[in-house]
Structure formats: C-alpha cells, structure tokens
Design a protein with these regions (language model features):
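Hydrophobic alpha-helical transmembrane segments of multi-pass membrane transport proteins
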Residues: 34-41, 45, 73, 92-107, ...
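Transmembrane alpha-helical segments that form core, pore/gating elements
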Residues: 70, 128-129, 145-147, 152, ...
Length: 304
C-alpha cells in the first residue's frame, strides 16, 4: 500500500496517519480547554521567578526552553526545507511575534495586575471575532461574551503607565499570533505543530539579544533552570500545540470568541486551587460568557 502524500511531497506513515485519526476524533473545544488551563499555570510559575531573575530573562527562558523541547520532540527544521518563500516568511513573522509578544506580556504583568493585562489582551480577540460575526446570531454571541468578560475582569486603570504600553503591545501581538497561527495550521498536512516548532526556534534566537543576560543567573542554579523550563512547557509548548490542534478545525472568528472563556477558567481555577470564591458579579459574567459561546455557530472559514 502506498503512503499518503503531503503537499510538501513527504509521505505520511501509517503510524502518523493513525495518530492524526485519533486526534481528529477529539473535539477541537477540548484542545482549547487544555490550552486555557495551562494559559494560567505558566504565568503562576513565572511570577515566582520574578523575585530571582530579571523579567526579560524569564521571558527568554520561556521561549528558549520551549524551543529546546520542540527541537528534541519534532526536529522542526525538516519542515522548513520544502516551504516556499511565502511559507518561510510566515514562519519568520510568527517567530518574531512570539519573541516580542512573550517579552511584552511579562513586562506588562510585572507592572500591572494579571487580570488587567488579560482583559486588555481580550480586546484584540473581540476585534477578530467581530470581523467574522457575519450573522445576527453570532453578533449577539459576541455582545454576550464581551459583556461577560467585562463583568469578570473589572479592569483597574491603576499602575505604571509603561505597563499599559506593554499590555496594549501584547494585545496587538496576540492578534497577530492568532492570524499567523491559523495560517500555519491551515496550510495542509500534519506539519502545523512542526511549523510552530520552527517558529519557536526563530523566536528563541530573536529574543536572545535582550533576554539571555537576564537569564544567566539561572544557569548556576538548577532549580531556577528547571522552573524556567517548566514555564516554557506550561506557557508555550502545551498551550501553543493545543492552539494549533484547535485552530486547524475552528475558524479564526470562532477561536477568537472562545478566548472569552479564558477569564472563566481563571475564575474557576482560582476558586478550586486558591479558594478565591467568585462574587455574584463573577457568576453573572461567567453565565454571560457561557451563553455567548453556546449561542455562537461556526461559519465557513472564508476569512482565512
């Protein structure tokens, strides 16, 4: 039996085809849920490192350790050779976005509450979701989820002004991550995760000039280095891989709308792990978000 051929000309082995089939039976919303949970576990580890390492060093450790994992796991450079000029430009752009986005995010949370940074980050996803809300039903879903997130997050306009600069920069870069991430997820074949890994290697190189110096103290303390690796796995490997698996089967607008569930996950995790019980306003916000996501209906991915 001949092996199935990819657009790149590489063959899909029966084992790889079987793995794809098993993943295809998992609802894309499940991958999104995994990404959402680890979206908040990673920053919790990173905050602990801020007391021992420079913020830029923590950001570099996150990207670099994720790049090492992808290099050992996927050997992503194999996917770069067959790419055309456009595909390589996309990888370079995504790598640059990942490097600067992760840096801007940590510079923001070092100066502002995490909830404020997260709420500002959601503004970009609202724009992407609105661009794809082509039906009254989906427009209503967008209104419900936006109102729900506003009720949950309660942005406080306090903190260092520079923190807001970094937070809005992170917001813009997160939008680009979604756009570019969808592009590589929908280029055909099973190589989306490999292309993501290649972009992460580019990100690690790009962030080295401003991040390596701040990370050097960790190389003399194995516990710090291990914690940095944990941040990379929890913040960049698991959630970004899960994003790729979800993006390959969800339109950009639907994926953006589902990001409204991130504050819901944060509230639930806070209640279970930290005993931070939600207020009546939190419960109302969660209800609106869940109703909005349930109301939304997937549309053909014409915006891609």
């Amino acid at each position: 039996m001949s092996a199935e051929r990819l657009p790149t000309g590489r063959a899909v082995t029966p084992a790889a085809s079987g793995a794809q089939g098993r993943l295809g039976r998992v609802p894309p919303q499940a991958f999104f849920g995994v990404s959402a949970v680890f979206h908040y576990l990673g920053p919790s580890l990173a905050v602990l490192l801020f007391a021992r390492l420079d913020v830029l060093g923590v950001a570099w450790l996150r990207v670099a350790s994720a790049a090492v994992v992808f290099a050992l796991w996927r050997r992503p450079w194999r996917r770069v050779r067959p790419l055309g000029r456009g595909g390589r430009r996309t990888l370079l752009a995504l790598g640059a976005v990942l490097a600067v986005m992760n840096t801007a995010f940590y510079l923001a949370v070092d100066r502002l509450p995490l909830s404020t940074v997260g709420a500002i980050e959601f503004l970009g996803t609202v724009i992407l979701a609105a661009a794809g809300a082509r039906t009254p039903r989906n427009a209503a879903a967008l209104v419900l989820t936006t109102a729900g997130v506003a009720a949950i997050t309660a942005i406080r306009v306090t903190g260092q002004p520079l923190g807001f600069v970094f937070a809005f920069a992170n917001c813009a870069l997160f939008m680009l991550y979604i756009v570019l991430g969808h592009r590589i997820a929908n280029e055909g074949g099973p190589g989306g995760i490999d292309r993501l890994g290649a972009a992460m290697l580019i990100a690690a190189v790009a962030a080295t000039p401003w991040g390596l110096g701040g990370a050097l103290p960790a190389f003399g303390h194995p516990a710090l280095l291990l914690a940095g690796a944990g941040v990379g796995v929890c913040s960049s490997v698991i959630p970004y891989v899960s994003d790729q698996l979800a993006m390959a089967r969800l339109s950009r607008a639907t994926f953006s709308l589902m990001l409204a569930l991130l504050p819901v996950f944060a509230t639930v995790i806070g209640a279970i792990v930290l005993r931070q019980l939600p207020t009546v306003q939190d419960v109302a916000g969660i209800t609106l978000v869940v109703l909005g996501v349930a109301l939304h209906r997937e549309q053909p991915q014409r915006e891609e």
